[in-house]
């Protein structure tokens, strides 16, 4: 049985995930008997999901097998009772917990790589599953020989082998294994693909399952191109604030095609460590809203995150992000430098003493300011509209008020005549 060994070196400590099924037992046997010269140390890991009575028999069998062959083994018993009780599917959660534990063991042992027994038939199954469940649009269509999970390396040395080759190898060497009868239950989608769809393809002389591999290769190349275009957009158009919000031009975003838009959003949520896996139909709804003519609105993402649309600006932000930093009011009694909601306020020493104390506060209904160089006053709210200030930013901008309740300055948008030499306000909110 010819497995690929270029995923590790002769000095490597390899960790092999073994379920006691025919695939993983054949891989373990092959590493012990045919490829023992390709690594320095081999350790076995096994997860007992505790969902079948036979699972404890399998655990005992593998423990004894490793003892006889002088292999270190680590076993994890998962408690999935909470998921089963809720009636939820356990497959994805069990996989997540398995691989997290594998990572813990690899870190503990300072091992180099985790080996799994995925093979070519598993690859066909994965491609079909992702295609027909809509999981292929923004993800790789299949598995790769090498990947990473939480910073540790996973390698699949049997990904080139057909199931029939593994069966022949097991039979020739009389390798002991256990059959998980749940693998025969066609209520699970992957089992149905494995037992019904793939055999039907193989039986039809006009069909060739290997064409799926060509599709995977083409798809992965195109996906990489999309990611590169999305990264270019992010590098050129997206600004990041020190509070981990991302903002960019609504117009520039609307000029992208839907595929690049989707990948841009994926990458930004990944950078925010949101752990979101948004379905394409949700993205399509968002993109339709972003294309409309409404000047300001919010798009609900999760209970913690929103997308704020403000004129030509699109902002991804935490819902609580603005409120938790907002100051409402401060009092200035002497010259100096002051901070107010990410704005820096510099009061010059030559500001007439009789003007103190100054009040710095956010806007209030009815606030007006005197127009420079002309008669009359203008509402602060109208200034914000004219300058296309976002709703959130309007709650942060400092107004400097004197004892007579006259507005001397409004953020970096306005300073009253005769005070420009004494009051300087700058917006530091976008500094990192």
Swiss-Prot record:
Enzyme superclass (EC): ligase
Binding site for ATP: 19-24
Cell compartment(s), UniProt: Cytoplasm
Gene Ontology CC entries for this record: cytoplasm
Keyword ATP-binding in annotation: yes
Name of a matching Pfam family: ATP_bind_3
Protein keywords: ATP-binding, Cytoplasm, Ligase, Nucleotide-binding, tRNA processing
Stretches that traverse the bilayer: none
Listed Gene3D superfamilies: HUPs
Free-text domain note: The N-terminal region contains the highly conserved SGGXDS motif, predicted to be a P-loop motif involved in ATP binding.
Assigned protein family: Belongs to the tRNA(Ile)-lysidine synthase family.
Function per UniProt: Ligates lysine onto the cytidine present at position 34 of the AUA codon-specific tRNA(Ile) that contains the anticodon CAU, in an ATP-dependent manner. Cytidine is converted to lysidine, thus changing the amino acid specificity of the tRNA from methionine to isoleucine.
Protein name: tRNA(Ile)-lysidine synthase
Organism annotation: Staphylococcus epidermidis (strain ATCC 35984 / DSM 28319 / BCRC 17069 / CCUG 31568 / BM 3577 / RP62A)
Gene this chain is encoded by: tilS
